[in-house]
Structure formats: structure tokens, C-alpha cells
Amino acid sequence: MNEQLLSKKNVVVTYYPQVNYIHIDWIGFQREQEIYDSGEEVLQIFQKLDCHKVLNDNRKVIGPWNKAAGWTQDYWFPEMIKAGLTHFAWVFPDNVFAELSANQAMPDTDIVHKFMDYNSAEQWLKTVTS
């Protein structure tokens, strides 16, 4: 059974044990401090799980969040990798400003793969092994 691990106005995190990944569903306009706070909470959750895969869903993100893009790329991703992240499927938003921010935050690593639709991202995570 799926387990909701975090629910805030800007993000919902759910663990899917049958396929062993966490789904991070970002919602609405993302304020800089909310990204930092929620990102830290996601990191703490991930550190406690025996899980190595993330489905990062930006389909519901509205507007830019570029002020936190550097932090995401330079701090959050390295910390997630230290915590055991091996596969990160990133579903990009349709919103052009949110997409620009996501592109800025995307690290140069084989761990992170960009997808334009949810089903392709989910299918990829189900086929990769940790």
C-alpha cells in the first residue's frame, strides 16, 4: 500500500513500496524558502528509506522558481546522491517559466533523466534497477 510521507501546500511526497520509489508532487507557485524547507524535509525522508529512486513531478508547478535553482543543483542533488539516490525521473511542467527554472536546476549527471510526460517517467523507473 502506498504511504503518504509529507503533505504541504506546495508538495506531497508518497512512497510506493511495490516499485520502491518516492513520488514528489510539487504543487502551484514555489516560493524560494518553501523550496528550501520542503527540499530539506524530502532529503530527511529519503535518508530514512531503503529507496534509491525518485519520481519528481513538476506538472502542477506554476511560474518561475529560479532563485532556488542553484541551491537545488549545488546542494540538494549532491545530498540526495549521498543519501543513496541512483535514479531520478523528472517530469517537466508545461509552464514555460517553471520549465526554465527546472532546466537551471538540473544537474549534469546520468542519475537525472528529463521526461515530458508522467507515464514515460514512471515506466522508466519501473525498469531500472538500483
Annotate the PLM regions.
Residues 2-130:
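Amphipathic, Lys/Arg-enriched alpha-helical "gate/interface" segment within cytosolic domains
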